[in-house]
């Protein structure tokens, strides 16, 4: 079978497309559908482990995750378990093809069979007659209480990219802050500052932060933010374990960011502390 040459610098040649290739159906996030269903392009593997494959597609990160992984907001989700993931052997720097509704791996085509819509935090609605109405709403945050661009940039610079791994601890905390701020309609300056510094962190983490700036996150995280913003302790207690179980410390760092944003929504310019610990549970509210 004829192999397709790829550009110099990539460690492998492109996959062979043939009649005996395995086909695995997947559900593509509405946030990534245009990339996966667009023209066929070369993509680069950013990272690979059993539950997930992270691809750079035309400068955007497209995660591909198994059924037992956290369903990231921009992900292509498969029904197979991580033990049967079709990307074994792929490593950072390898080349694959993405487009025309397919993710073409060596020996396997992942087919975008359907589209799924990721979870998004609910905007706060102020209802004085509702016990579950948030105690804080964007209409109650005076313009002088909102962070200036300079304040937001200083705070974001203190957190972004801080810590090891594909999603550093500082980024996870920032994601929690962004989600709460988006729910309250006050994310503008912080979101702009984060997007201006996305090159300061990993490509995978940058994609997660970009989604969080628009209120998107894994369903487990959105459930916790919605419960915390609504001031519903029972719902928080139900949602918290699933978030704390995310990654080695990512869930705990997200909780730190969520709690910090809830406590200091009127002074977001002071959210500059790097998470000191990810080994304990931070109360929310």
Can you describe what each PLM-predicted range is?
Residues 1-3:
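Short, Lys/Arg-enriched N-terminal segments with co-localized hydrophobic residues
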Residues 5-134, 140-154, 165-170, 183, ...:
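Phosphate/adenylate-binding glycine loop and adjacent helical scaffold
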Residues 133-142, 176, 277-282:
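Intrinsically disordered, low-complexity proline-rich regions
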Residues 160-168, 211, 241-249:
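A short glycine/serine-rich beta->alpha loop
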Residues 166-181, 250-262:
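Conserved phosphate/anionic-ligand binding catalytic regions in large, soluble enzymes, centered on
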Residues 220-224:
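A translation/RNA-centric and nucleic-acid-associated enzymatic feature enriched
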Residues 225-285:
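Acidic, carboxylate-rich catalytic segments that either coordinate divalent cations
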């Amino acid at each position: 079978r004829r192999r397709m040459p790829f550009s110099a610098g990539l460690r492998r040649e492109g996959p062979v497309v043939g009649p005996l290739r395995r086909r695995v159906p997947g559900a593509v996030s509405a946030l990534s559908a245009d990339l996966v269903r667009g023209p066929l392009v070369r993509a680069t593997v950013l990272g690979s482990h059993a539950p997930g494959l992270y691809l750079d597609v035309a400068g955007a990160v497209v995660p591909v995750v198994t059924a037992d992984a956290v369903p990231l907001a921009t992900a292509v989700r498969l029904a197979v378990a991580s033990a049967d993931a079709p990307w074994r052997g792929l490593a950072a720097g390898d080349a694959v093809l993405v487009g025309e509704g397919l993710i073409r791996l060596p020996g396997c085509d992942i087919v975008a069979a359907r589209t799924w819509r990721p979870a998004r935090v609910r905007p706060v609605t102020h209802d004085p007659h509702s016990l579950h109405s948030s105690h804080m709403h964007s209409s109650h945050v005076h313009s002088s209480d909102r962070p200036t661009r300079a304040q937001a940039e200083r705070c974001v610079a203190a957190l972004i990219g801080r810590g090891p791994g594909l999603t550093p601890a500082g980024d996870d905390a920032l994601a929690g802050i962004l989600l709460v701020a988006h729910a309250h309609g006050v994310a503008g300056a912080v979101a702009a500052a984060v997007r201006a510094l996305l090159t300061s962190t990993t490509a995978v983490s940058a994609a997660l932060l970009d989604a969080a700036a628009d209120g998107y996150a894994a369903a487990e995280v959105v459930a916790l933010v919605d419960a915390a913003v609504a001031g519903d302790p029972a719902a928080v207690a139900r949602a918290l374990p699933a978030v704390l179980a995310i990654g080695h410390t990512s869930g705990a760092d997200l909780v730190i960011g969520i709690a910090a944003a809830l406590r200091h929504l009127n002074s977001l310019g002071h959210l500059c502390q790097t998470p000191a610990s990810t080994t304990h549970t931070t109360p929310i509210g």
